[in-house]
């Protein structure tokens, strides 16, 4: 599972201008435990006590994202325990009355089209689930209201606002160990606005946005070997991807931390582990 992130990724999320319905992360936002049944959480996971006392359980950057984007729902993993919380955004941040994971507020409505307010009551409903093994509480069904147009096909679509953020921050991507300084705020240039607007006109379907192409292709040989010590004697090579090539070309961007597919296999980047 990928759960490490850079300041740039957090900056990009904080720069997203529209409402978000659902966030899915590995880590919990920090201090989210204060807005659920903390006593029950510590009863199940007593080794969390020191981190709770020090107010360092969870990710501070993700709490910034939670406060900024205010999604209707936030789902996390990582801590291998089922836990629910209701986080208020527009009133006192005092921990709410503990809610169980099974408790649903009345008249709950969530949306997934057109970026209306994330939740009518100005809260985020947080849910983490237990480890996916027998006898653990690892599943819960959550129903969301969606626009009927979202159900007409099984395709995924690019989000125009996110494309603008990606295009405007590409110059901040670097392979150097020292990251480039980030601006205080992200301003979307007129050029980027025009590029994305043209993409929506030329490639969009007029309703849901720009369809993500189904252009998967095999870019590396299949692996059939096995090594008990985790090393098969080969050297891993950096490989490009046709989907990355197409994505960058669509936005008029160059490779900065990736390589084109046609250059795959030319640069050694370490050993291959299995």
Model-predicted regions and their roles:
Residues 1-271:
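Extended recognition/assembly regions associated with phosphoester-bond processing machinery
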């Amino acid at each position: 599972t990928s759960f490490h992130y850079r300041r740039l990724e957090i900056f990009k999320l904080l720069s997203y201008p529209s409402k978000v319905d659902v966030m899915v992360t590995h880590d919990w936002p920090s201090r989210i435990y204060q807005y659920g049944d903390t006593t029950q959480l510590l009863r199940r996971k007593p080794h969390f006590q020191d981190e709770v006392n020090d107010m360092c359980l969870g990710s501070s950057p993700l709490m910034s994202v939670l406060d900024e984007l205010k999604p209707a729902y936030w789902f996390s993993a990582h801590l291998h325990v089922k836990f629910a919380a209701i986080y208020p955004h527009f009133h006192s941040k005092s921990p709410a009355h503990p809610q169980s994971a099974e408790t649903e507020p009345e008249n709950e409505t969530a949306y997934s089209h057109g970026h209306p307010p994330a939740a009518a009551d100005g809260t985020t409903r947080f849910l983490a689930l237990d480890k996916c093994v027998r006898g653990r509480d690892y599943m819960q069904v959550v129903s969301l209201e969606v626009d009927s147009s979202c159900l007409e096909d099984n395709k995924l679509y690019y989000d125009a606002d996110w494309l603008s953020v990606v295009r405007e921050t590409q110059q901040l991507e670097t392979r150097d160990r020292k990251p480039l300084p980030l601006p205080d705020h992200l301003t979307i240039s007129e050029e980027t606005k025009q590029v994305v607007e043209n993409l929506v006109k030329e490639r969009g379907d007029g309703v849901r946005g720009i369809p993500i192409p189904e252009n998967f292709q095999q870019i590396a040989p299949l692996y059939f070997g096995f090594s008990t010590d985790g090393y098969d004697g080969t050297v891993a090579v950096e490989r490009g991807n046709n989907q990355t090539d197409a994505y960058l070309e669509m936005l008029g961007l160059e490779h900065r931390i990736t390589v084109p597919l046609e250059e795959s296999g030319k640069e050694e980047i370490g050993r291959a582990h299995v």
